[in-house]
């Protein structure tokens, strides 16, 4: 089962990824915790350029897709074939939100690049964390973007959530309550998957 957590920086997403993977491991599910951009030595080597270097938006998109291809083929797909639960911090919907709605790159171009590279994959479950507001932390290129850019990304995420039925939108309510809601949704999805596989 492939689970992805999405959201803008400062939404608490990375914290919830760690909490969810701990819950799954405690419940006896073999779990792989990973992130994007990154997850392999090659993808991690591109991460710094993607997040920190002043490069053209299309060049950044191509780096992101390159990192994703390597990550998907070397980490995600093998783990899924072994029957493990993969919990990933960001995946394709981040690219649609940031590069599509933020950088204004045509969405179909982004999808076509993924299709051509063999990683146009919909996760089994995507949890989109929407906070009350963006925290401008200034740690990377995206966090330093103007408020208008970040507003476009947020709007993009909301539009994407309406386009894809496997995305569950979660309003952040503090670490504890948000974690409880995530666990409840994941438990339901796992039960649903187990039931369908028994038919």
Curated annotation (Swiss-Prot):
EC number: 2.7.4.9
Keyword tags: ATP-binding, Kinase, Nucleotide biosynthesis, Nucleotide-binding, Transferase
Binding site for ATP: 7-14
Keyword hit for ATP-binding: yes
Xref: InterPro entries: P-loop_NTPase, Thymidylate_kin-like_dom, Thymidylate_kin_CS, Thymidylate_kinase
Listed GO CC annotations: cytosol
Entry's Gene Ontology molecular function annotations: ATP binding; dTMP kinase activity
Broadest EC class assigned to this enzyme: transferase
Domain of life: Bacteria
GO biological process: dTDP biosynthetic process; dTTP biosynthetic process; dUDP biosynthetic process
Catalytic activity: dTMP + ATP = dTDP + ADP
Family: Belongs to the thymidylate kinase family.
NCBIfam families recorded: DTMP_kinase
Summary of the function given for this chain in its UniProt record: Phosphorylation of dTMP to form dTDP in both de novo and salvage pathways of dTTP synthesis.
Name of the protein: Thymidylate kinase
